[in-house]
A protein has these predicted regions:
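Active-site-proximal alpha/beta segments of enzymes that process anionic O-linked groups
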Residues: 1-8, 13-27, 35-40, 47-162
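DG-centered beta-turn motif at the end of beta-strands
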Residues: 43-46, 172
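Structural motif
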Residues: 37-39, 166, 213
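Secondary-structure boundary elements
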Residues: 115-120, 159-165, 201-212
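Active-site regions of oxyanion-processing enzymes, predominantly non-cytosolic
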Residues: 152-181
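Short secondary-structure transition/capping segments
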Residues: 114-126, 168-179, 212-213
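A long, amphipathic alpha-helix that forms part
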Residues: 153, 175-213
């Protein structure tokens, strides 16, 4: 879907078609023009339980990003398995990550596809996280940060600089606390609130800094 929106050929190993419910409104808004700048905010583990427990936060996300397309999680739903599938378009059987492990992916990814198309990519993630590790060794810019607030700060600076076509920003506080205390524990939901607030700030920065695109 990301490749289709941006006019980039999909990864060689991709098995999943682009999501038409996402492409249709993009075509209606842009016609044949591709998306020229894209921010992907990737907070770990936010799903239906979060939305049910804090509908106010889900509404805050919808106010900024109103299009929602329900999807099933990859099985098994471990972070590296999910992100490997998301950014390759391939199943775990194809990309090779089937448990909680962080090898560098050997197959083609969205990031490879973007760089082949001459697009500049940045991944901003908490140091040693799955997203920080499994996509290494590619011709893109990696920023390994101390924790979520530093990720947000760096992502905001990259958006303002306007030199990257695709910026990925990964947060993990909700996932960290959820595994320790449960998905609807107040501390976990406080982490979710922090993710939503960061997303709102990043979306506002994108609207301002990338308006000419």
């Amino acid at each position: 879907t990301l490749c289709a929106l941006c006019g980039v050929p999909m990864p060689f190993d991709g098995e999943s078609p682009a999501l038409e419910p996402v492409l249709a409104p993009a075509r209606a808004a842009l016609g044949a023009e591709p998306v020229r700048r894209c921010l992907v905010f990737a907070p770990d583990a936010l799903g239906d339980q979060f939305a049910a427990a804090r509908p106010d936060l889900a509404a805050a996300v919808a106010a900024v990003a109103p299009l929602a397309v329900p999807l099933h999680s990859i099985d098994p739903p471990w972070t590296p398995v999910c992100f490997a599938s998301m950014f390759t378009g391939a199943s775990p059987a194809r990309h090779g990550i089937r448990k909680y492990e962080k090898p560098v992916l050997a197959i083609d990814t969205v990031f490879d596809a973007f760089t082949r198309a001459g697009r500049r990519v940045a991944i901003v993630a908490v140091a040693d996280s799955s997203l920080d590790r499994i996509f290494r060794g590619r011709a893109l810019d990696y920023y390994s940060e101390k924790y979520d607030p530093w990720v947000t700060e760096k992502a905001l600076s990259l958006v303002a600089a306007d030199r990257h076509d695709l910026v990925i920003a990964y947060h993990q506080e909700y996932d960290d606390v959820m595994h320790a205390l449960g998905p609807v524990h107040p501390r976990a939901l406080r982490g979710a609130r922090n993710h939503v607030e960061a997303f709102v700030d990043l979306a506002a920065a994108v609207e301002s800094a990338w308006a000419r695109h």
